[in-house]
Each structure stands twice: as structure tokens, then as C-alpha cells.
Design a protein with these regions (language model features):
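Amphipathic alpha-helical assembly/interaction segments
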Residues: 1-168
Length: 168
């Protein structure tokens, strides 16, 4: 599926849900202490969706990947601060909420990693580099690969002695 807007990306939706959850969590009195924990936790969680959005809007795969890695790092930072918070007795009443947010951050991190992995293995350099000629070349290559695969499957049936058994 091709997404035209970052707001439609499932990973961005997960990231924004994480940020909203963190903002709600940090309204608790535990986070009303001297220090920067509240602010840093909020900034890190919001950084995830912001970096996904910025990378998506850049137009090249290389730039998108760079921003996805930053977003993934912010997921880790958010999770680390949530783990830090869990070590104190005062926020025991927030245990369930913190656990849910850690899971959400992990989910977001996995989605970002999967997307980044698929982009690294892609021949497309990004929307900025797509024009009619490069689209045609890409589509022709995909059709050729599909045809070669179909041809090999047919030959395996007709001449099985020429092909070793497929590894599973």
C-alpha cells in the first residue's frame, strides 16, 4: 500500500498514541518534581512521531532512513525513562499505564525497524527521484522478475531432474 500522507502511516499513528499516552502519564504528581524527567520524557516520546513525519516528507529514501533511525532511538529513550520511573516506589499506582506505554514504545520500535529494513532493500531512491522513466524501469524490472519466477516454477515441473529440491 502506498501512503500519500504521514498521518495515514500505521507506525506514525502508533507513535502519536505513544506521545499522547506519555503526556497523560506525566500529568501525575510524581512527575511534578524538580528536574527534567517530565520534559525529557515528553520530548523523547513526541520526537518519535515528529521524526517519522519529517523523514516521510523529505522525499528521498536515504533521508527517510536517517529520520527513522532517529525516531527509533527516541523510542528507546522513551522506554528507558519509563523503566527508570518504574524503579521508584512513588509511581506504583502508574504501573499498568507505564507497562502499556513500554509495550507501545516497543511496538513502535519494531514497526520502524521493519520499515527501515524494507527500505534498505529497495531499489527506489525515494519519491523525489521518481519520474515516469524510473517508474517504468522499476515496473519493467518487477514484471521481469515475476516472469522469471513463473518460468522457473514451470520448468521445475516439466524438468525436475534439472533442478535440485527447493530448500525449506
Amino acid at each position: 500500500m502506498k501512503y500519500e500522507r504521514f498521518e495515514d502511516l500505521p507506525v506514525w499513528q502508533t507513535a502519536i498514541e505513544l506521545a499522547v499516552g506519555v503526556y497523560n502519564l506525566t500529568r501525575d504528581r510524581f512527575y511534578n518534581q524538580p528536574g527534567d524527567l517530565r520534559s525529557q520524557l515528553r520530548r523523547a516520546s513526541l520526537s518519535v512521531s515528529n521524526n517519522i513525519a519529517e523523514g516521510f516528507e523529505r522525499g528521498s529514501t536515504a533521508e527517510l532512513l536517517a529520520f527513522l533511525y532517529i525516531a527509533r532511538g527516541s523510542c528507546g529513550e522513551t522506554r528507558s525513562m519509563l523503566l527508570f520511573t518504574e524503579r521508584f516506589p512513588e509511581p506504583a499506582h502508574l504501573k499498568s499505564e507505564i507497562s502499556n506505554l513500554k509495550s507501545l514504545a516497543e511496538s513502535c520500535s519494531r514497526q520502524i525497524r521493519a520499515w527501515a529494513d524494507s527500505l534498505q532493500n529497495s531499489d527506489i531512491k525515494g519519491q523525489r527521484h521518481l519520474n515516469d522513466k524510473t517508474r517504468d524501469i522499476y515496473q519493467a524490472r518487477k514484471r521481469s522478475e515475476a516472469f522469471e519466477k513463473q518460468l522457473e516454477e514451470m520448468l521445475r515441473k516439466v524438468c525436475p531432474q534439472d533442478y535440485p529440491p527447493e530448500e525449506q
